[in-house]
Amino acid sequence: DGPTAIFVANTLNSQYLGAIMVAAYSYMALVPIVQPPVIKLLTTQKERRIRMSYKKGSVSQLTKILFPIVVTIIAGMVAPASVALVGFLMFGNLLRECGVLNALSETAQNVLANLITIVLGLTVAGQMTADKFVRPDTLLILALGLVAFVFDTAGGVLFAKLLNLFLPEGKKLNPMIGAAGISAFPMSGRVVNKMGLEEDNQNFLLMYSISVNVSGQIASVIAGGLILTLMA
């Protein structure tokens, strides 16, 4: 998770901020390359073809508004240090769903998001001097990032398979959606959906995989807050 990794590293005054940022965003971009082999290694073709039941329904406007508020409160109780990140994430969600701040919502989604991305890149790039970046430690951080990414993917798939042991036929999960439980949003969700369509061109997993992907993003922010709380 790029923003969380940068926030935690900066708060802890890490000298490896540049390397951590490169590792985080590199592996987020490499989702289509890293995840499929791990998923295929841990699942059978039959499991990858599992179709999940879908119930049509609408979400009330009140629920959409309460969701970011409740998530922020719960995250603040579990890991107070995570509020700075999860609060901004949920604030953007609230801007979009409240229905009365359309101009601010469009600005935040487009102009502001792009501007912050540029400023973030320039800020961190200023710290990536040769004496801090061109070091053996940088390779170790990149390797650690790859290991973490692989284990995250494998852990999600295996946990979904574990849940299937207790679920009745007709309600079993497609284990591939477990791999989307990381913060690489929305790339991981799309990769899982694409893999599902490759196995069965009528098996649409996008709604499930994106939902898991969002959960992974929120959990990642809370995990970063827990790290700061434990190391404070």
Question: Where do the model's predicted regions map?
Answer:
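Interfacial helix-loop-helix linkers and transmembrane-helix boundary segments
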Residues: L101-N110, M128-A143, A160-K171, L197-Q202
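Alpha-helical transmembrane segments
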Residues: Q15-I33, L142-D152, I177-A180
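Transmembrane alpha-helices that form the ion-translocation and gating core
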Residues: L122, Q127, A143-V191
